[in-house]
Amino acid sequence: MPSVRSVACCCLLWMMLSVQLVTPGSPATAQLSGQRTARGPGSAICNMACRLEHGHLYPFCNCDGKRDVVSSSMAV
């Protein structure tokens, strides 16, 4: 039975490989439904990784000072 950590890592890897982020005005890019503005590279991946405390696995993510969505306190 796979552990929660390995399942979370697989989900993050799947998201990183399957989600194509959109930059405004760029030709031939798919846009996710309901998306109005482009987000920074990997921001959805970083947000999830920081929430799951796996940000250290992604060197481009900066989890310092991210707000905890549930308690609205600063994450440590």
UniProtKB/Swiss-Prot annotation:
Disulphide-bridged cysteine pairs: C46-C61, C50-C63
One annotated GO molecular function: acetylcholine receptor inhibitor activity
Location in the cell: Secreted
Propeptide, residue positions: 28-39, 65-76
Keyword terms: Acetylcholine receptor inhibiting toxin, Amidation, Disulfide bond, Ion channel impairing toxin, Neurotoxin, Postsynaptic neurotoxin, Potassium channel impairing toxin, Secreted, Signal, Toxin, Voltage-gated potassium channel impairing toxin
GO CC annotations on file: extracellular region; host cell postsynaptic membrane
Signal sequence, start to end: 1-27
Primary localization: secreted
Domain of life: Eukaryota
Known tissue expression: Expressed by the venom duct.
Residues the record lists as Aspartic acid 1-amide modifications: D64
Transmembrane regions listed in the UniProt entry: none
Similarity section: Belongs to the conotoxin J superfamily.
Record's function text: Highly inhibits both nicotinic acetylcholine receptors (neuronal (alpha-3/beta-4) and muscular (alpha-1/beta-1/epsilon/delta) subtypes) and the voltage-gated potassium channel Kv1.6/KCNA6 subtype.
Record remark: domains: The cysteine framework is XIV (C-C-C-C).
Protein name (database record): Alpha/kappa-conotoxin-like pl14.3
